[in-house]
C-alpha cells in the first residue's frame, strides 16, 4: 500500500496537503513547516506508543521507536522539548507541534482541520489490515 502526501500550500509555519492511498484522496494533512519531514519515502508501522498508550502510525524506522521516548533534542531553534516519534495522528492545529507529526482530517481554514478522529480511525484501520495481510506500507511525501 502506498500512502502519498502531496504538500500543496505553505504559509508561515503551516504546511497543508492532500493524503492519497493508491491514488485516491482520503483526507487533508497539516504539518508544522519548521519541523516537517523531508520529501521522500518512509516505511510505516504500527507501534504501541508510550505517550498515547495505544498503537499509533509511526513513520520511519521503528526498531527502537519507543525505547528512548521521550528524548530531549533540539527540535525548534534552540528550544529543548520532548521529541517523540514522527507519526500520523489526529489533531486540529499544528501550532505548538514541533515533533514532525502529520495531522489528518478535513480542511476547515488555513492552519485548521476538522473531524480528525474519523479520518485517523479510517486510515489506521486500512494500514492495520494491510500490515496484518503481510503487505508493506510506504509513505511518499512530495512537495
Residue ranges and their predicted role:
Residues 1-137, 143:
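Cell wall/extracellular polymer interaction/catalysis modules
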Amino acid at each position: 500500500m502506498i500512502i502519498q502526501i502531496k504538500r500543496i500550500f505553505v504559509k508561515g509555519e503551516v504546511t497543508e496537503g492532500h493524503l492519497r492511498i493508491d491514488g485516491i484522496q482520503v483526507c487533508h494533512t497539516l504539518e508544522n513547516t519548521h519541523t516537517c519531514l523531508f520529501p521522500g519515502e518512509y516505511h510505516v508501522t504500527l507501534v504501541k506508543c508510550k505517550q498515547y498508550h495505544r498503537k499509533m502510525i509511526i513513520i520511519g524506522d521503528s526498531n527502537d521507536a519507543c525505547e528512548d521516548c521521550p528524548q530531549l533534542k533540539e527540535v525548534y531553534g534552540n528550544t529543548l522539548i520532548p521529541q517523540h516519534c514522527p507519526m500520523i495522528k489526529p489533531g486540529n492545529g499544528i501550532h505548538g507541534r514541533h515533533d514532525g507529526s502529520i495531522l489528518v482530517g478535513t480542511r476547515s481554514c488555513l492552519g485548521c482541520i476538522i473531524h480528525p478522529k474519523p479520518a485517523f480511525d479510517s486510515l489506521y484501520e486500512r494500514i492495520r489490515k494491510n500490515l496484518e495481510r503481510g503487505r508493506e506500507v510506504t509513505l511518499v511525501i512530495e512537495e
